[in-house]
Every structure is written in C-alpha cells, then in structure tokens.
Amino acid sequence: MPHAKTAMKAIAKKTKAKRQHTRMPDNSSSKEEVSSIEEDSSLKEESQLGVTETLVWDLPLRLFHWALSLSLVGSWVTAEAGFDWTETHFLFGYTALGLISFRLLWGLLGTAHARFSNFLTGPKAVINALGQLKQKTPPGEVSHVGHGPVGGWASVVLLALVLTQAVSGLFISDDIFYAGPYNSAVSSSLADYLGWLHHTNFNILLAAIALHLITITWYLLGKKENLIGPMLTGNKNISPSLAHRKTQSKTQPMTQPAVYSNPLWRGFLIASFVLVMIVLLVNLAPEPEYF
C-alpha cells in the first residue's frame, strides 16, 4: 500500500506539472501580445511627440510644379488633337521651356529645399534610400524633410527630359504645315534627328511620369505617407530626429524653417527674367525659308 500511495502521488505531481506546462505558453503568449500592443502604442506616441508642422516647399516651387503638370498635359492633348491645335501646342512648349528655366535658376537661388545642393547625393545614399522604400513611415511623420536621395535625382531626370522635349521642339518640322521657330537655323538632317528625338523622348517622358505617379501611390498606400498634400500646402510634419539633420550642403540646420525668408520677391524677379528671355527667344528667331 505505501508503494501504491507513493505511485499515486508521483502521478498526481506529473499531471499537475503537465497542466502547468500546457498553460504557460498561453500566459506567455498573452503577455507578449499585450507588451507588443503597448510597445506599438508607445512608439506611436513617441513618433507623434514633438512633431512640428514646417513650411518646406515654398510658393514659387509649388506654382512651378503644378504649372509644369498642366503644360505637359496641354502639350500632350494638343499634339494628339491635330493640325488646328499646332500653335497652341507650341505655346505649351514655350511655357514648359520657361518653367524649366525658372526651376534651374530656382535650384541655385531659391530657398533651402529647392536648391540642388541640398538634395543631390552620392550613389551610396541613393542605394540606402532604395532599401528603405519598403519601410512604413511612422504615423504623422515624413521620410525626408525635402527631397530624399531617390526623389532628388528623379526630379532632375524629369527636368532633363522636359528640357530635351522643349528644346528639340524649337527645331522640328513636318515639312508641310508647321515648323519650330529655329527649324531654318539648322540643316535638314539635324532637323530630322531632332524631330526623331522629340518624338522618342516624349515616350521616355511618359514612362518617367508614370513611374513618378506609381511612386506617389506607393508612398500613399504602402508607406502611409502623403506626398501630394505638402506639394499643395508646402507644409510637412517634421519629427525631432529629422529636425536635427543637416542639409546636404551643411549650410543650414533643419531646426531652422526651410523657408527662412519671404521668397516671393526673388521668385517674381526670376520669373520675370525668364519670361523676357522666352519672348526674345521666340521673336528673335530667324525667318523661315520658303521655296
């Protein structure tokens, strides 16, 4: 009997131990879930703590962006509309050329985040930025104060494509109805080449614009970061970690407002200069040759 009692006690201990063992994962998993929820909520609170709304994109830059978008759409529509819209197509081309000229000057003389020196980086930074595209942006924050390494070079590529499109259009001709203002200034073979470039570059430009729109959509749906809103209002929510970074040129800390002075007078002067240059460019073109 003593042996039987001892055996019964041993069985009872093993059964109790098994019950405790089977219950432990449930308790630990529930604790892990709770701690994970608490950690996520604390990270969210920390990410929103100290976030300040800062004016990043100045008004001249925003006006340029949307005016260029309209001119590109207008150029495309009038090119497809036929001969009756040829003059309007050229007007959209001149507008695009003027806008690109303004942006190039604004990239040298404009406010902090409009300047090329503040967002054009080396290949290492671009590769690192590409690897971070899959990461979600913390709620209420942004990935970069101004252009990121990828976005900076993407904007330069788009500017180069639009510039190529506008300049080549000055020399093209269909040999029957219309000709660019400087068609007679070049040889027929060069004009033919520039005509080919104008049409080929347009397809490349369309692909680049499509990629641009896809990237914006990915940021909105994948990274949960709205890029369209700041280009309308100019404002971004800047976290403390981003606020203490330096610009690429290391001339202005991010703790200072991106638009540290009223840029409107400077933008107006540059826009006026560009307008005069475009008008002179068109009106001083050589007279077309007639046979």
Language model regions located:
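Membrane-embedded alpha-helical bundles that constitute the cytochrome b-like, heme-associated redox core
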Residues: 2-291
